[in-house]
A protein has these predicted regions:
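Polybasic/polar functional segments that serve as interface/processing modules
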Residues: 1-111
Length: 111
């Protein structure tokens, strides 16, 4: 049986609302396929610290949020640009989170 998933656009709009409720500035920086585009979340912690999160499958075939790039913002932007070159349906959500409050789907991302 296939996994039930929310449409990408719906999930992103929910994340924007959650960020707004928690006073975290957030913006959809890149729009992809409304139904099934992959989502990258760029979390900007400071001028020198940034992470990119993506959903991946773990060893138990469960989807988990994973840090796929980290470092200064330009390194994270380069990772996103490479992903966008191969995936035109890619979405990018950017969040300013200096206190490290953001948790996608309420879970701590894996490193």
């Amino acid at each position: 049986m296939s996994e039930v998933r929310l449409k990408s656009e719906f999930w992103l709009k929910a994340q924007l609302r959650l960020c707004d409720q928690n006073c975290l500035p957030a913006v959809i920086a890149r729009r992809g396929d409304a139904d099934a585009g992959q989502v990258l979340v760029k979390v900007i912690q400071s001028m020198q610290a940034c992470e990119v999160l993506a959903q991946r499958y773990d060893d138990d075939a469960q989807r988990v949020w994973t840090v796929v790039s980290h470092g200064v913002e330009r390194d994270c932007d380069a990772y996103i640009a490479r992903e966008a070159d191969v995936d035109p349906d890619l979405w990018v959500l950017e969040i300013e989170d200096p206190k490290g409050q953001y948790r996608p789907d309420g879970e701590e991302p894996r490193r």
